Each structure stands twice: as structure tokens, then as C-alpha cells.
């Protein structure tokens, strides 16, 4: 059943929409032209200002920042997903204390700005006797914050599965934790892959907050290059383009996976029969592991 949010536009409405689109485009182009004119008047479009960005040493310097960005994001992903899984299980647990603790963690760390967490990790923890380098301060902040986000993503994935998945697993003799580990979690992870990748893109962009603690990720390296060459605008444009390319690539992968997942579900690949087959495989693996 589809929901119609508004009537279809008639000929007059379509003409008005076309005129509005053309007018908005014209205004945007005018702003762009004005900005370029101002930049040109101040010499910001001179070739000499941009030529420094193609120098090998500058390129290597910026690529080093990109490596640092990817390294911090990749390392932070691991504890974030592990703790996120624990939080998801805690949120759906029959144990009241586990639900309360997991819920409190999620609510607290989703409410605190990530910038504040990174600042606390670098400047606050030393007051408690824990000294972290800029790199580990960024990783720690990203990890504790994104654990709460991934916890909600995984919980949504678990709750989106048919209850028959767990019931079928329990009916053939698996313990509840075995059913969750062998049957439910693998399917929940697969179902939420597009969302996981989308959050990974956000995590990658959030590494730029490391500039506040002098971590030399891509943005910080761009800032240094701009100050050294006295062309900060050009350096920031180069950094923005690198972020754009990386994030567009990850977003494209996420969209493709989302389309593939949607087609699988529409084709009925996830069904009760599929659940029974999954449980049978899981039980076989469990028995085989126990025999070994």
C-alpha cells in the first residue's frame, strides 16, 4: 500500500516548478561567479598559488595525512563494533541490569558531542593519571562514541529478523547464546552492512576533529601545508577534494550493497525455510566444533 503525500502537479504547477528551478540555478551561478570574481581580484586563482599542491613533497605530505586518517578510523572501528555488539545484546537482554547499563551507555555517549570526548581523552585523562598521545586520544574518542551508534545499528538488525529464527534454533537444542552467535548475529550483520558502511563514512570524516588535539590527520596536514606555502585556501580545497573522493567511493559501495540486499529480500531469499537451513548449518557447525 502506497501513501500519496500530495497531488500530482498539473501543467501550471509544472511550469511554476520549472521556473523556480531555473531561477534557483541562476542565483546559484551568480553567487559562484561573484565568488570567483572576488577570488580572482585577490589573486587566489593565480597559477602560482595552486602549483605548490602538485609538488611531490606536498603530495607525499598530504597522502601521509590521509594514511593517518584511515589508520585512526580503521583502528577505532574494531572496538566500536565489538562494544557495539555487546551493547546491542545488552539492550535486548532479559537481564534488567544489563538492559539498564547498556541503555545508559548508549544514551550518554550519543548525547555527548564527539569533539568533547576527544578533548577529554587528550586533556582530561592526564588529570586522572592516564596520558594518551593525540593518535590514541582520537581513536579512544571515536571508539566510545561510535560504539553507542553501532550498538543501535546492530540492535535494529537483530530486531528486524523474524522471531522464528531464534525459536527454530532453540527448538533444535541450541542454547540462547548459541542461537544468537550462530544464527541471529551473522544475519543481522549482513542485513545492516549498508548502514554499517554509512556510519563508517561518518566515522572517517569525524577523524578531522583530531585537529583539536594536534593529531596530524588529513585536515591537520592540509592546515600545515597551507601555512607553510601561505596558500591556506588552496590547501583546504585539496583536502576537501580528497575527502570527497574517499567518501563518495565508500558511499557508492554502501548504495550498491543496499540495492543488492533489497533485491534479495524482495526475492524472498530470507524466509522460514532459509531460517531452518541456517539453523541446521549452525547446529552442524556447533556439533562439529564440539566433537573436535
Question: Model regions: which residues?
Answer:
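Transmembrane alpha-helices and adjacent helix-loop boundaries
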Residues: 1-292
Amino acid at each position: 500500500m502506497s501513501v500519496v503525500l500530495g497531488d500530482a502537479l498539473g501543467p501550471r504547477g509544472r511550469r511554476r516548478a520549472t521556473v523556480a528551478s531555473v531561477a534557483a540555478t541562476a542565483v546559484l551561478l551568480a553567487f559562484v561567479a561573484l565568488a570567483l570574481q572576488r577570488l580572482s581580484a585577490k589573486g587566489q586563482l593565480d597559477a602560482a598559488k595552486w602549483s605548490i599542491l602538485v609538488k611531490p613533497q606536498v603530495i607525499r605530505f598530504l597522502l601521509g595525512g590521509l594514511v593517518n586518517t584511515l589508520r585512526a578510523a580503521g583502528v577505532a572501528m574494531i572496538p566500536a563494533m565489538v562494544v557495539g555488539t555487546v551493547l546491542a545484546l545488552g539492550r535486548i537482554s532479559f537481564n534488567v541490569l544489563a538492559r539498564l547499563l547498556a541503555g545508559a551507555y548508549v544514551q550518554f555517549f550519543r548525547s555527548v558531542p564527539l569533539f568533547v570526548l576527544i578533548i577529554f581523552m587528550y586533556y582530561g585523562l592526564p588529570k586522572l593519571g592516564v596520558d594518551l598521545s593525540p593518535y590514541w586520544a582520537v581513536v579512544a574518542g571515536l571508539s566510545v562514541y561510535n560504539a553507542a551508534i553501532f550498538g543501535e545499528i546492530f540492535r535494529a538488525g537483530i530486531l528486524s529478523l523474524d522471531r522464528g529464527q531464534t525459536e527454530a534454533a532453540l527448538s533444535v537444542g541450541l542454547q540462547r547464546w548459541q542461537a544468537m552467535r550462530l544464527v541471529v548475529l551473522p544475519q543481522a550483520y549482513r542485513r545492516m552492512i549498508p548502514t554499517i558502511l554509512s556510519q563508517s563514512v561518518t566515522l572517517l570524516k569525524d577523524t578531522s576533529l583530531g585537529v583539536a588535539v594536534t593529531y596530524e590527520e588529513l585536515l591537520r596536514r592540509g592546515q600545515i601545508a597551507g601555512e607553510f606555502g601561505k596558500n591556506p585556501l588552496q590547501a583546504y580545497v585539496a583536502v576537501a577534494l580528497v575527502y570527497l573522493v574517499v567518501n563518495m567511493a565508500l558511499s557508492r559501495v554502501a548504495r550498491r550493497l543496499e540495492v543488492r540486499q533489497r533485491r534479495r529480500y524482495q526475492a524472498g531469499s530470507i524466509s522460514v525455510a532459509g531460517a531452518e537451513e541456517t539453523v541446521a548449518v549452525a547446529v552442524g557447525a556447533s556439533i562439529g566444533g564440539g566433537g573436535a
